[in-house]
């Protein structure tokens, strides 16, 4: 027997990927609904070998489903997630709206799976920011072994993190440069083709962007509030796949060989780390894949106990849709989905 599942925001990059992954992992589904805004009513999306038409979020009866995956804006989620949760189903929300709410668990299943047990406070579970998701999967097993003191991260984030408009802008500018000149930027503040932009989101008063703040706030909530973490987030002209250069300082001794072994034996991680010119992972190779990949693991000789590493993942998958589906699988394994429906 399967569940009744709705995907809200089904026409976007992440919403479509949610549908793809639900089918790929054979999540037990009796009935699937694609939900979108009024302007997308009737738009067709695929679910395995089936084509389903989008239904209107304003008219849909959410008491008829057990689980809702949300891929919408934070503003939309702030309005709709509480309404949907009150109707009975558990909402797994991919926006930033609920991540720091003390009554909403922020979950990466490889990192803090037990937090799903208190999802019934609001019937909402938050998905972390895409760049945070891959980072914490790599940090958690090392923290468990040697207690992380400080982390310095530089991200190299693909344009798909800004949605279809971001991908279209990179494509149009790249083509345009070789024909009539690049069209002016619309989605990004400056030209993204053949360029990098050290700015994602909006500036805060301290000079950091909200994208950078999300990473340390979310890491603190999921792993340990005592970890000192500083971040620079950069948009790069890559379609799909986020990369991160990560420097870690530990309280306790941990060398590169032991770290490599720990990471190899940790869930959700694949270590690709050979010291030749192709012995590392790139975002292109990670596209379409489930794991978080770790490469370039090496000691940092500038501190007593330190490491450097390179972390890569498909941001539309582990950074968003896959993590949401993995949370759904965790709820299923623990028998929490049916409990939510009965409580509603």
Show where each model-derived region lies:
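Helix-loop-beta segment of a Rossmann-like dinucleotide-binding subdomain
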Residues: 119-126, 195-206, 309-311
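N-terminal Rossmann-like NAD(P) cofactor-binding subdomain of oxidoreductases
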Residues: 1-192, 228, 261, 275, ...
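Generic solvent-exposed, charged/amphipathic alpha-helical segments
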Residues: 19, 216-220, 260, 264
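Glycine-rich beta-alpha junction loops
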Residues: 38-40, 130-131, 155-162, 196-203, ...
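Oxyanion-binding "anion nests"
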Residues: 192-239
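C-terminal active-site/capping subdomain that shapes the small-molecule cofactor and substrate pocket
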Residues: 227-344
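A glycine-rich, Thr/Ser-enriched phosphate-binding loop motif common to dinucleotide/cofactor-binding enzymes
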Residues: 123-134, 207-216, 221, 319-323
């Amino acid at each position: 027997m399967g569940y009744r599942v709705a995907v809200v925001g089904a026409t976007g990059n992440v919403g479509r990927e949610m549908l793809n992954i639900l089918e790929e992992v054979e999540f037990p589904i009796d009935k699937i609904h694609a939900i979108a805004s009024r302007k997308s009513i009737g738009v067709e999306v695929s679910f395995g070998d089936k084509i389903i038409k989008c239904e209107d979020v304003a008219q849909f009866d959410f008491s008829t489903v057990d689980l809702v995956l949300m891929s919408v804006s934070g503003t939309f989620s702030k309005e709709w997630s509480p309404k949907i949760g009150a109707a009975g189903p558990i909402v797994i929300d991919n926006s930033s709206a609920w991540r720091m709410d003390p009554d909403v668990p922020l979950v990466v299943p490889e990192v803090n799976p037990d937090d799903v047990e208190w999802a019934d406070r609001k019937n909402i579970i938050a998905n972390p920011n895409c760049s945070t998701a891959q980072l914490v999967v790599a940090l958690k097993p090392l923290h468990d072994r040697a207690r992380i003191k400080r982390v310095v991260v530089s991200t190299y984030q693909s344009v798909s993190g800004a949605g279809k408009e971001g991908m279209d802008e990179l494509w149009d500018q790249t083509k345009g440069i070789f024909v009539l000149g690049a069209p002016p930027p619309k989605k990004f503040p400056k030209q993204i083709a053949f360029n990098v932009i050290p700015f994602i989101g909006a500036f805060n008063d301290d000079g950091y962007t909200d994208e950078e703040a999300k990473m340390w706030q979310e890491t603190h909530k999921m792993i340990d509030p005592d970890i000192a973490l500083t971040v620079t987030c950069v948009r790069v002209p890559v379609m799909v796949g986020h990369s991160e250069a990560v420097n870690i300082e530990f309280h306790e001794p941990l060398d590169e060989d032991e770290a490599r072994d720990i990471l190899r034996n940790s869930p959700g991680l694949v270590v690709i780390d050979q010291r030749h010119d192709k012995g590392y992972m790139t975002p292109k190779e990670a596209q379409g894949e489930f794991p978080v990949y770790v490469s370039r693991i090496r000691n940092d000789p500038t501190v007593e106990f330190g490491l450097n590493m390179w972390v890569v993942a498909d941001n539309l998958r582990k950074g968003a849709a896959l993590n949401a589906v993995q949370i759904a699988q965790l709820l299923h394994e623990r028998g929490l989905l049916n409990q939510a429906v009965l409580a509603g």
